[in-house]
Amino acid sequence: ITTHLQFCDQCREAVSGLNILGGELLTECDEAELSDDLLAQTLAMLDAPMATNKDAEAAAETPKSSLCPDLASQLPKYLHRFLNSQELEWRSLSSTLSVAAISVGETDYELALHRIDAGGKAPVHDHKGTELTVVLKGSFSDEDGIYREGDFLMREPGDIHRPSATQDQACICLSVLSAPIKLTGIKQVLNPFMRFNPS
């Protein structure tokens, strides 16, 4: 969601409005009991060394991963913290589709970058679990519509589709999967070999 918000002004405004509403609702709540050591904890946090602007800029610099510098500079800054510490291993799933799993320490979901070459198509597939996708670069279409940079979509079991990148450029997406995809048609014989890499 944070990645989508980086692309969508309207959604950022909506989140800001919801944060303001939440603050207003908190002012109407009854006072809560506070722990005896809350003041000491707060003062300790205030005394802790603060990160400087240079530290923040360094943390958000272009990731030092196996992404090409051109693509890395276009990724949302939120993703840089995951990509700075690892080499991405791109695997070819078809002649026009590659995937690179991103290790985030999660065991129930896989976070990955998917790249469909310009004019390329992913195999027709269903979903064994939930798939959340944000388009980071380029665009693709499927049976339900066209998705451009910043667009967010969700697929569930029974949602069969075949993403196709536009002819003018490759499409890079960030996806979160709760289970591997399920190939359909003649390629379904490959399903036992589909890897799922939550980490």
What does each model-found stretch correspond to?
Residues 6-9, 13, 20-86:
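Positively biased amphipathic helices and basic secretion/translocation or surface-docking motifs
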Residues 10, 121, 151-152:
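Residue-level marker of beta-strand positions
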Residues 15, 122-124, 143, 161-167:
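Short beta-strand His + acidic residue motifs that chelate non-heme Fe in jelly-roll/DSBH
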Residues 87-120:
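A short glycine-rich, His/Asp/Glu-containing loop-to-beta-strand
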Residues 117-120, 127-142:
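Glycine- and acidic-residue-biased ligand/ion/polar-headgroup-sensing regions
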Residues 142-162:
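Short acidic-glycine-tyrosine-enriched beta hairpin
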Residues 159-183:
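Ligand-binding loop in jelly-roll beta-barrel domains
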Residues 174-199:
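Double-stranded beta-helix
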